[in-house]
Amino acid sequence: MIRIENLTKIYTSRKEQVVAIEDISLDIPKGAIYGIIGLSGAGKSTLVRCINRLEEPTGGKIIIDGQDLTAMSAVELRQARQKIGMIFQHFHLLQSRTVFDNIAFPLEIAGFKKPEIEARVKELLPLVGLEDKAHVYPSQLSGGQKQRVGIARALATNPKVLLCDEATSALDPQTTLSILNLLKDINQRFGLTIIMITHEMKVVKEICTDVAVIHESKIAEQGPVESVFIQPQSSVAKEFISTVFPNELPEDLLRELATHPNSQIVRIQFLGSRASDPIIADLMKECEVRANILYGSIDHLRSTLFGTLTLELQGDPGQLALAHQYLAQRELKVEVIQNV
């Protein structure tokens, strides 16, 4: 659906060159909700603005539905952009226009006739839960309602792709969740491909099917959300994951545990139906080890259960080896944190 090949953006001034993004390549499947996460200044917003050529790339290609946007003329690009919607962190609504007229604006620019515009706006208002706000002005709306107007406006021209640049960063947690649920519903209902730019791993956890981690202008890691959460390869991905699944033990506890003979500290991760398995009870019974729970959490990656357990296992070397074999047979990821 979307292929980004070796995309680079360099800002040049008289004194220096600043590399905003460098040699970025991504394949984004049709119908995916693709998260691009990074710290402030990593280059993620530049990347999303290059995708629809609000920023002109210095090099590389952006291919959507087989068409290279970087090779298009101004007229061709204007037509292509009608199939790419975008929503922003700070909404960018026209304060002098009503909700109805804000949603209608891109249709007016695209040259749609008045009856077509009216029909489309009336179709979008209930979709975003604003059917009773058509003639209200932005100043009378909450932050969440303003973003719903932004979403409806972005959907007005029936796009195939929706770009979301920090779309929930200005919202409170409850409103954030309602906006994410709306985007998830739109994705499932219309098969829309959504690209989510964010610095919050909880957004990725809640809604994304795939994720790319961008760090210092380059892609540090990418893949299906489940794979990245369970087996992160980069230090920056591990740091982001720890913000939603904190699993580091206090140093004083680790020092105390280090005095326990014949013990091992392990972290176990499980996904899906494994979350309801009696892992610890079976482990103690089958392997004759003692298992002390030090930390545990369980949550969802989209609709899939994901959990971690940090255990102190006590037993002789043979029992500990048998415990690892038992866990491996159940396809659980096991990481040894500390041997004693």
UniProtKB/Swiss-Prot annotation:
<keyword id="KW-0813">Transport</keyword>
<dbReference type="Pfam" id="PF00005">
    <property type="entry name" value="ABC_tran"/>
</dbReference>
<dbReference type="Pfam" id="PF09383">
    <property type="entry name" value="NIL"/>
</dbReference>
<dbReference type="GO" id="GO:0005524">
    <property type="term" value="F:ATP binding"/>
</dbReference>
<feature type="domain" description="ABC transporter">
    <location>
        <begin position="2"/>
        <end position="241"/>
    </location>
</feature>
<dbReference type="InterPro" id="IPR050086">
    <property type="entry name" value="MetN_ABC_transporter-like"/>
</dbReference>
<keyword id="KW-1003">Cell membrane</keyword>
<dbReference type="GO" id="GO:0005886">
    <property type="term" value="C:plasma membrane"/>
</dbReference>
<dbReference type="InterPro" id="IPR017871">
    <property type="entry name" value="ABC_transporter-like_CS"/>
</dbReference>
<dbReference type="InterPro" id="IPR045865">
    <property type="entry name" value="ACT-like_dom_sf"/>
</dbReference>
<keyword id="KW-0067">ATP-binding</keyword>
<feature type="binding site">
    <location>
        <begin position="38"/>
        <end position="45"/>
    </location>
    <ligand>
        <name>ATP</name>
    </ligand>
</feature>
<protein>
    <recommendedName>
        <fullName>Methionine import ATP-binding protein MetN</fullName>
        <ecNumber>7.4.2.11</ecNumber>
    </recommendedName>
</protein>
<comment type="function">
    <text>Part of the ABC transporter complex MetNIQ involved in methionine import. Responsible for energy coupling to the transport system.</text>
</comment>
<comment type="similarity">
    <text>Belongs to the ABC transporter superfamily. Methionine importer (TC 3.A.1.24) family.</text>
</comment>
<keyword id="KW-1278">Translocase</keyword>
<dbReference type="InterPro" id="IPR018449">
    <property type="entry name" value="NIL_domain"/>
</dbReference>
<dbReference type="InterPro" id="IPR003439">
    <property type="entry name" value="ABC_transporter-like_ATP-bd"/>
</dbReference>
<dbReference type="GO" id="GO:0016887">
    <property type="term" value="F:ATP hydrolysis activity"/>
</dbReference>
<comment type="subunit">
    <text>The complex is composed of two ATP-binding proteins (MetN), two transmembrane proteins (MetI) and a solute-binding protein (MetQ).</text>
</comment>
<keyword id="KW-0547">Nucleotide-binding</keyword>
<dbReference type="GO" id="GO:0033232">
    <property type="term" value="F:ABC-type D-methionine transporter activity"/>
</dbReference>
<keyword id="KW-0472">Membrane</keyword>
<keyword id="KW-0029">Amino-acid transport</keyword>
<dbReference type="InterPro" id="IPR027417">
    <property type="entry name" value="P-loop_NTPase"/>
</dbReference>
<dbReference type="InterPro" id="IPR003593">
    <property type="entry name" value="AAA+_ATPase"/>
</dbReference>
<dbReference type="InterPro" id="IPR041701">
    <property type="entry name" value="MetN_ABC"/>
</dbReference>
